[in-house]
From Swiss-Prot:
It is found in: Cytoplasm. Keywords: Cytoplasm, Lipid biosynthesis, Lipid metabolism, NAD, NADP, Nucleotide-binding, Oxidoreductase, Phospholipid biosynthesis, Phospholipid metabolism. It catalyses: sn-glycerol 3-phosphate + NAD(+) = dihydroxyacetone phosphate + NADH + H(+); sn-glycerol 3-phosphate + NADP(+) = dihydroxyacetone phosphate + NADPH + H(+). Disulfide bonds: none annotated. Its main location: cytoplasm. It comes from Rhodopseudomonas palustris (strain BisA53). One of its GO terms (biological process) is glycerol-3-phosphate catabolic process. One of its GO terms (cellular component) is cytosol. Pathway: Membrane lipid metabolism; glycerophospholipid metabolism. Sn-glycerol 3-phosphate binds at residues 107, 135, 137, 190, 243, 253-255. This is Glycerol-3-phosphate dehydrogenase [NAD(P)+]. Gene3D superfamilies: N-(1-d-carboxylethyl)-l-norvaline Dehydrogenase, domain 2, NAD(P)-binding Rossmann-like Domain. The keyword Glycoprotein does not apply. Belongs to the NAD-dependent glycerol-3-phosphate dehydrogenase family.
Protein backbone atom coordinates (compact mmCIF):
# COMPACT_ATOMS: atom_id res chain seq x y z
CA UNK A 1 0.00 0.00 0.00
CA UNK A 2 1.23 3.53 -0.79
CA UNK A 3 2.10 5.88 2.05
CA UNK A 4 -0.65 7.88 3.72
CA UNK A 5 -0.16 11.65 3.62
CA UNK A 6 -3.63 12.85 4.64
CA UNK A 7 -6.02 11.64 7.34
CA UNK A 8 -9.61 12.59 8.10
CA UNK A 9 -11.07 12.16 11.57
CA UNK A 10 -14.86 11.88 11.76
CA UNK A 11 -15.98 13.03 15.19
CA UNK A 12 -14.85 16.09 17.12
CA UNK A 13 -15.36 14.71 20.61
CA UNK A 14 -12.53 14.11 23.06
CA UNK A 15 -11.19 10.95 21.40
CA UNK A 16 -11.57 12.29 17.86
CA UNK A 17 -9.78 15.51 18.79
CA UNK A 18 -6.98 13.57 20.47
CA UNK A 19 -6.48 11.35 17.42
CA UNK A 20 -6.53 14.38 15.12
CA UNK A 21 -3.79 15.91 17.27
CA UNK A 22 -1.77 12.71 16.99
CA UNK A 23 -2.12 12.49 13.21
CA UNK A 24 -1.01 16.11 12.88
CA UNK A 25 2.01 15.50 15.11
CA UNK A 26 2.85 12.53 12.90
CA UNK A 27 3.14 14.93 9.97
CA UNK A 28 -0.15 14.21 8.21
CA UNK A 29 -2.53 16.76 6.72
CA UNK A 30 -5.59 16.38 8.95
CA UNK A 31 -9.26 17.16 8.34
CA UNK A 32 -11.47 17.00 11.44
CA UNK A 33 -15.16 16.56 10.62
CA UNK A 34 -17.73 17.45 13.26
CA UNK A 35 -21.47 16.98 12.80
CA UNK A 36 -22.55 19.07 15.79
CA UNK A 37 -22.75 22.74 14.78
CA UNK A 38 -21.94 24.14 18.23
CA UNK A 39 -18.83 22.04 18.72
CA UNK A 40 -17.75 22.63 15.11
CA UNK A 41 -17.95 26.38 15.71
CA UNK A 42 -15.89 26.02 18.88
CA UNK A 43 -13.30 23.96 17.03
CA UNK A 44 -13.08 26.48 14.21
CA UNK A 45 -13.10 29.70 16.21
CA UNK A 46 -11.38 28.79 19.48
CA UNK A 47 -9.36 25.86 18.06
CA UNK A 48 -10.59 23.79 20.98
CA UNK A 49 -13.17 21.03 21.44
CA UNK A 50 -16.01 21.45 23.91
CA UNK A 51 -15.21 17.92 25.05
CA UNK A 52 -11.46 18.44 25.52
CA UNK A 53 -11.03 21.90 27.04
CA UNK A 54 -7.53 23.27 27.37
CA UNK A 55 -6.19 21.44 24.32
CA UNK A 56 -5.44 23.73 21.37
CA UNK A 57 -5.68 22.15 17.94
CA UNK A 58 -2.47 21.68 15.99
CA UNK A 59 -2.11 24.19 13.10
CA UNK A 60 -2.21 21.37 10.53
CA UNK A 61 -5.79 20.43 11.48
CA UNK A 62 -8.59 21.77 9.28
CA UNK A 63 -12.09 21.66 10.77
CA UNK A 64 -15.09 21.05 8.51
CA UNK A 65 -18.76 20.10 8.56
CA UNK A 66 -18.57 18.99 4.92
CA UNK A 67 -18.40 15.19 4.82
CA UNK A 68 -17.37 15.21 1.15
CA UNK A 69 -14.32 17.30 2.02
CA UNK A 70 -13.28 14.85 4.72
CA UNK A 71 -13.86 11.92 2.37
CA UNK A 72 -10.99 13.02 0.13
CA UNK A 73 -8.36 11.94 2.68
CA UNK A 74 -6.08 8.95 2.10
CA UNK A 75 -7.40 7.27 5.26
CA UNK A 76 -10.34 8.00 7.55
CA UNK A 77 -10.63 7.46 11.30
CA UNK A 78 -14.23 6.80 12.36
CA UNK A 79 -14.43 8.21 15.88
CA UNK A 80 -18.17 7.92 16.46
CA UNK A 81 -20.16 5.76 18.92
CA UNK A 82 -20.53 2.11 17.97
CA UNK A 83 -24.30 2.31 17.65
CA UNK A 84 -24.20 5.10 15.03
CA UNK A 85 -21.24 3.80 13.03
CA UNK A 86 -23.41 2.20 10.34
CA UNK A 87 -25.30 5.44 9.74
CA UNK A 88 -22.07 7.44 9.36
CA UNK A 89 -20.38 4.91 7.07
CA UNK A 90 -23.50 4.62 4.90
CA UNK A 91 -23.37 8.40 4.33
CA UNK A 92 -19.62 8.28 3.74
CA UNK A 93 -19.52 5.32 1.34
CA UNK A 94 -20.55 7.13 -1.91
CA UNK A 95 -17.99 9.87 -1.26
CA UNK A 96 -14.78 7.88 -0.81
CA UNK A 97 -12.41 6.40 -3.35
CA UNK A 98 -12.03 2.65 -3.78
CA UNK A 99 -9.74 0.92 -1.28
CA UNK A 100 -9.80 3.82 1.17
CA UNK A 101 -8.92 2.56 4.67
CA UNK A 102 -11.75 3.20 7.15
CA UNK A 103 -10.51 2.74 10.71
CA UNK A 104 -13.09 2.14 13.44
CA UNK A 105 -12.07 3.74 16.74
CA UNK A 106 -15.11 2.69 18.79
CA UNK A 107 -15.20 -0.38 21.01
CA UNK A 108 -18.49 -2.20 20.87
CA UNK A 109 -20.91 -4.54 19.10
CA UNK A 110 -23.94 -3.39 17.11
CA UNK A 111 -27.34 -4.02 18.69
CA UNK A 112 -29.68 -6.31 16.81
CA UNK A 113 -27.10 -7.58 14.31
CA UNK A 114 -24.28 -8.61 16.69
CA UNK A 115 -21.88 -7.16 14.13
CA UNK A 116 -18.42 -5.92 15.00
CA UNK A 117 -17.21 -2.53 13.82
CA UNK A 118 -15.21 -3.77 10.83
CA UNK A 119 -18.13 -5.96 9.75
CA UNK A 120 -20.36 -2.89 9.72
CA UNK A 121 -17.79 -1.03 7.61
CA UNK A 122 -17.55 -3.95 5.16
CA UNK A 123 -21.33 -4.04 4.74
CA UNK A 124 -21.93 -0.29 4.52
CA UNK A 125 -18.86 0.53 2.39
CA UNK A 126 -17.92 -2.65 0.47
CA UNK A 127 -15.19 -0.90 -1.55
CA UNK A 128 -13.35 0.35 1.54
CA UNK A 129 -10.60 -1.34 3.56
CA UNK A 130 -11.90 -1.92 7.11
CA UNK A 131 -9.50 -1.57 10.05
CA UNK A 132 -9.68 -1.15 13.81
CA UNK A 133 -7.71 0.96 16.29
CA UNK A 134 -7.87 -0.13 19.92
CA UNK A 135 -5.82 -0.34 23.09
CA UNK A 136 -5.23 1.33 26.47
CA UNK A 137 -5.64 5.01 25.68
CA UNK A 138 -7.45 7.92 27.28
CA UNK A 139 -8.17 10.97 25.14
CA UNK A 140 -6.70 13.42 27.64
CA UNK A 141 -3.41 11.51 27.79
CA UNK A 142 -3.11 11.21 24.02
CA UNK A 143 -4.02 14.86 23.44
CA UNK A 144 -1.37 16.00 25.93
CA UNK A 145 1.27 13.91 24.18
CA UNK A 146 1.76 11.44 27.02
CA UNK A 147 3.26 8.05 26.03
CA UNK A 148 0.60 5.72 24.63
CA UNK A 149 0.67 2.41 22.74
CA UNK A 150 -2.25 0.96 20.77
CA UNK A 151 -2.94 -1.70 18.16
CA UNK A 152 -4.12 -1.09 14.60
CA UNK A 153 -5.44 -4.19 12.84
CA UNK A 154 -6.45 -4.84 9.25
CA UNK A 155 -6.87 -8.05 7.26
CA UNK A 156 -4.01 -7.03 4.96
CA UNK A 157 -0.70 -6.76 6.83
CA UNK A 158 0.53 -4.05 4.45
CA UNK A 159 -2.53 -1.90 5.20
CA UNK A 160 -2.10 -2.34 8.95
CA UNK A 161 1.59 -1.42 8.70
CA UNK A 162 0.88 1.66 6.58
CA UNK A 163 -1.77 2.88 9.03
CA UNK A 164 0.53 2.32 12.00
CA UNK A 165 3.28 4.27 10.26
CA UNK A 166 0.89 7.11 9.41
CA UNK A 167 -0.19 7.53 13.05
CA UNK A 168 3.22 7.02 14.64
CA UNK A 169 4.69 10.02 16.42
CA UNK A 170 7.06 10.51 19.33
CA UNK A 171 4.50 9.77 22.04
CA UNK A 172 1.97 7.58 20.19
CA UNK A 173 3.19 4.11 19.22
CA UNK A 174 0.83 1.91 17.18
CA UNK A 175 1.58 -1.80 16.85
CA UNK A 176 0.11 -3.48 13.77
CA UNK A 177 -1.79 -6.75 13.54
CA UNK A 178 -3.89 -8.84 11.17
CA UNK A 179 -6.05 -10.26 13.99
CA UNK A 180 -8.94 -7.89 13.39
CA UNK A 181 -11.45 -9.99 15.30
CA UNK A 182 -9.18 -10.36 18.30
CA UNK A 183 -8.56 -6.62 18.57
CA UNK A 184 -12.28 -5.88 18.29
CA UNK A 185 -13.28 -8.53 20.81
CA UNK A 186 -10.83 -7.28 23.41
CA UNK A 187 -12.09 -3.72 23.20
CA UNK A 188 -15.77 -4.67 23.34
CA UNK A 189 -15.47 -7.23 26.13
CA UNK A 190 -13.34 -5.11 28.46
CA UNK A 191 -16.10 -2.47 28.55
CA UNK A 192 -18.37 -4.88 30.39
CA UNK A 193 -15.59 -6.01 32.74
CA UNK A 194 -14.81 -2.38 33.53
CA UNK A 195 -18.40 -1.87 34.70
CA UNK A 196 -18.03 -4.89 36.99
CA UNK A 197 -14.75 -3.56 38.37
CA UNK A 198 -16.34 -0.17 38.93
CA UNK A 199 -19.17 -1.77 40.89
CA UNK A 200 -16.61 -3.42 43.16
CA UNK A 201 -14.87 -0.09 43.69
CA UNK A 202 -18.11 1.81 44.25
CA UNK A 203 -19.26 -0.79 46.77
CA UNK A 204 -15.93 -0.36 48.62
CA UNK A 205 -15.21 -4.09 48.55
CA UNK A 206 -11.45 -3.54 48.68
CA UNK A 207 -8.34 -3.97 46.57
CA UNK A 208 -8.38 -7.77 46.87
CA UNK A 209 -11.87 -7.98 45.40
CA UNK A 210 -10.97 -5.56 42.61
CA UNK A 211 -7.91 -7.62 41.68
CA UNK A 212 -9.97 -10.81 41.69
CA UNK A 213 -12.72 -9.25 39.56
CA UNK A 214 -10.23 -7.93 37.02
CA UNK A 215 -8.38 -11.24 36.80
CA UNK A 216 -11.50 -13.35 36.41
CA UNK A 217 -12.81 -10.79 33.95
CA UNK A 218 -9.71 -11.39 31.86
CA UNK A 219 -10.45 -15.13 31.96
CA UNK A 220 -13.89 -14.41 30.50
CA UNK A 221 -12.37 -12.13 27.87
CA UNK A 222 -10.01 -14.92 26.75
CA UNK A 223 -12.78 -17.53 26.73
CA UNK A 224 -15.04 -15.36 24.64
CA UNK A 225 -12.27 -14.24 22.31
CA UNK A 226 -10.95 -17.69 21.52
CA UNK A 227 -14.51 -18.98 20.96
CA UNK A 228 -14.90 -16.35 18.25
CA UNK A 229 -11.54 -16.94 16.59
CA UNK A 230 -9.26 -14.43 18.32
CA UNK A 231 -5.59 -15.25 18.70
CA UNK A 232 -4.47 -15.85 22.26
CA UNK A 233 -1.52 -13.48 21.86
CA UNK A 234 -3.93 -10.69 20.92
CA UNK A 235 -5.93 -11.30 24.08
CA UNK A 236 -2.71 -10.94 26.06
CA UNK A 237 -1.73 -7.78 24.18
CA UNK A 238 -2.59 -4.10 24.25
CA UNK A 239 -6.14 -4.42 22.95
CA UNK A 240 -6.97 -7.20 25.42
CA UNK A 241 -5.13 -7.31 28.73
CA UNK A 242 -3.72 -3.80 28.28
CA UNK A 243 -7.08 -2.11 27.76
CA UNK A 244 -8.71 -4.22 30.47
CA UNK A 245 -6.05 -3.31 33.03
CA UNK A 246 -6.42 0.40 32.33
CA UNK A 247 -10.20 0.54 32.31
CA UNK A 248 -10.61 -1.55 35.46
CA UNK A 249 -8.47 0.75 37.56
CA UNK A 250 -9.51 4.38 37.11
CA UNK A 251 -12.63 6.58 37.01
CA UNK A 252 -11.22 8.12 33.83
CA UNK A 253 -12.88 5.14 32.18
CA UNK A 254 -16.55 5.92 31.53
CA UNK A 255 -17.45 2.28 32.04
CA UNK A 256 -15.57 2.09 35.35
CA UNK A 257 -17.10 5.34 36.63
CA UNK A 258 -20.55 4.12 35.52
CA UNK A 259 -19.98 0.92 37.49
CA UNK A 260 -18.81 2.92 40.52
CA UNK A 261 -22.08 4.84 40.50
CA UNK A 262 -24.04 1.59 40.34
CA UNK A 263 -21.96 0.25 43.22
CA UNK A 264 -22.84 3.32 45.28
CA UNK A 265 -26.51 2.51 44.79
CA UNK A 266 -27.43 4.85 41.94
CA UNK A 267 -29.95 3.75 39.32
CA UNK A 268 -28.81 2.90 35.81
CA UNK A 269 -30.30 6.14 34.46
CA UNK A 270 -28.72 8.29 37.16
CA UNK A 271 -25.36 6.51 36.94
CA UNK A 272 -25.08 7.29 33.23
CA UNK A 273 -24.95 11.06 33.94
CA UNK A 274 -25.71 11.70 30.28
CA UNK A 275 -22.40 10.13 29.20
CA UNK A 276 -21.94 7.14 26.93
CA UNK A 277 -20.88 3.96 28.73
CA UNK A 278 -20.55 1.60 25.79
CA UNK A 279 -20.41 -1.42 28.08
CA UNK A 280 -24.04 -0.85 29.05
CA UNK A 281 -25.01 -1.37 25.41
CA UNK A 282 -22.56 -4.22 24.90
CA UNK A 283 -23.41 -6.36 27.96
CA UNK A 284 -26.67 -7.96 26.73
CA UNK A 285 -25.27 -8.47 23.23
CA UNK A 286 -22.09 -10.01 24.62
CA UNK A 287 -24.14 -12.39 26.73
CA UNK A 288 -26.27 -13.51 23.78
CA UNK A 289 -23.15 -14.19 21.74
CA UNK A 290 -21.52 -16.08 24.61
CA UNK A 291 -24.56 -18.30 25.04
CA UNK A 292 -24.58 -19.04 21.31
CA UNK A 293 -21.08 -20.50 21.68
CA UNK A 294 -21.76 -22.05 25.11
CA UNK A 295 -19.14 -19.82 26.73
CA UNK A 296 -19.41 -19.44 30.51
CA UNK A 297 -19.28 -15.74 31.48
CA UNK A 298 -20.68 -15.29 35.00
CA UNK A 299 -19.35 -11.75 35.48
CA UNK A 300 -20.91 -10.60 32.22
CA UNK A 301 -24.17 -12.29 33.21
CA UNK A 302 -24.15 -10.44 36.52
CA UNK A 303 -23.54 -7.07 34.86
CA UNK A 304 -26.30 -7.67 32.30
CA UNK A 305 -28.75 -8.72 35.02
CA UNK A 306 -28.01 -5.59 37.07
CA UNK A 307 -28.45 -3.34 34.04
CA UNK A 308 -31.75 -4.99 33.14
CA UNK A 309 -33.09 -4.69 36.70
CA UNK A 310 -33.25 -8.46 37.15
CA UNK A 311 -31.07 -8.42 40.28
CA UNK A 312 -29.46 -6.04 42.73
CA UNK A 313 -25.76 -5.31 43.07
CA UNK A 314 -25.54 -7.13 46.41
CA UNK A 315 -27.44 -10.15 45.13
CA UNK A 316 -25.23 -10.37 42.04
CA UNK A 317 -22.07 -10.19 44.14
CA UNK A 318 -23.43 -12.85 46.48
CA UNK A 319 -24.27 -15.13 43.56
CA UNK A 320 -20.73 -14.84 42.18
CA UNK A 321 -19.17 -15.61 45.56
CA UNK A 322 -21.35 -18.69 46.14
CA UNK A 323 -20.69 -20.33 42.78
CA UNK A 324 -19.39 -23.93 43.06
CA UNK A 325 -15.66 -24.13 43.77
CA UNK A 326 -13.50 -25.14 40.80
CA UNK A 327 -9.90 -25.45 39.68
CA UNK A 328 -8.33 -22.27 38.35
Amino acid sequence: MTSISSIAVLGGGAWGTALAQTAARAGRAVTLWEHDATNAQQLQSARESLYLPGVTLEPAIKVTRDLAEAARADAILLVVPAQVLRQVVTSLAPLIGAQTPLIACAKGIEHGTHKFMTEIIAEAAPNALPAILSGPSFAADVARGLPTAVTIAAADAAVAQALAQAMNCGSFRPYHSTDVRGVELGGATKNVMAIAAGIVEGRKLGASALAAMTTRGFVELVRFGTAYGARIETMHGLSGLGDLTMCCSTPQSRNFSFGMALGRGESVATAAHGKLAEGAFTAPVLLEMARAKHVEMPISEAVAAILEGQTTVDAAIGALLTRPLKAE
